[in-house]
Amino acid sequence: MIQRKLILFLFCIISLGLKAQYVYHNAEEFPLYGKISDNTELHFERLDKSLKDKVSRPYLWFLSKNTAGLAVRFKTNSKNLAFKWEVVNNATMNHMAPTGIKGLDLYCFKEGKWKFVNCARPSDNHKSEAVLSAQKEVAVSEYMVYLPLYDGIKQLEIGVDSLAFIADPEIESPRRDKSIVWYGTSIAQGGCASRPGMAHTNILSRWLDCEIFNLGFSGNGQLDYEIAEFFVQSDASLFVLDCMPNVWEQKVYENLENFYNIIRAKHPTTPILFVQNGSVRKVGDLTISSILLLQ
């Protein structure tokens, strides 16, 4: 009997030790990349809260709560990294992996490049926990954790080993002095990447070493003027208009020129890249080149 109690006591002590080995920090304390305005309802969001009653469609506002393109940067000497996060919707889709929808994706800066570490798999409910092995030896390293593509984040905590430290990054990467605004559709938002770091805007951000503001809205990249009026407040080095799959001929003729002029009024010399719809199926389908020729 005494032996059983002793074993149970030791088991409890070990269990408590395992649970207490990480010290958690609020991720809002660290730099957030991919966000134009700090005036948002929740910290991890993409659109200014002043747009709530101005957006053309309620679903557009709903999608703005998705954290596509947002990433938290920090440095630590912890061998392991633990994450606790709570999503807004606990979204599921038949055509996209849960890790891409509502998981976290960890990268480490090594030898001048961002390298994949591991992906934090979400649970079946709103709250998830994951522990990722970051490095074999105790050494200070720079990290970036990408947030979910098709869900929002209410709360995110980063846990480090009990004797480790965590702080703001020393290296500015991706660089913020040559940022890009990427306006588009579900494709730009990240559908259907298997994990957040594999959304093509996030891949390009690492390749080009520049911050990209992801304004991809699934089914809702419809040349809405209020979105252009919002993103022109950024000091971007390039504006990418990648919304053709979500607009129809009449919408393009009605909105494209005004949308373009909103950008040009604030950024008269900044390059604007028009991206053609890759799904042109037949001769006569509307293309950006045909629009410009007709005008």
Predicted features, each with a name:
Residues 2, 15-179:
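N-terminal secretory targeting modules
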Residues 156-158, 192-196, 252:
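Short, solvent-exposed loop/turn and secondary-structure capping segments
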Residues 177-201:
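Catalytic nucleophile-elbow at a beta strand-turn-alpha helix junction centered on a G-D-S/GDSL motif
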Residues 186-191, 214, 244-250:
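Surface-exposed cleft-lining segments at the edges of enzyme active sites
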Residues 201-214:
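Short helix-loop-beta junction
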Residues 220, 224-295:
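Alpha-helical cap/lid subdomain in secreted, periplasmic
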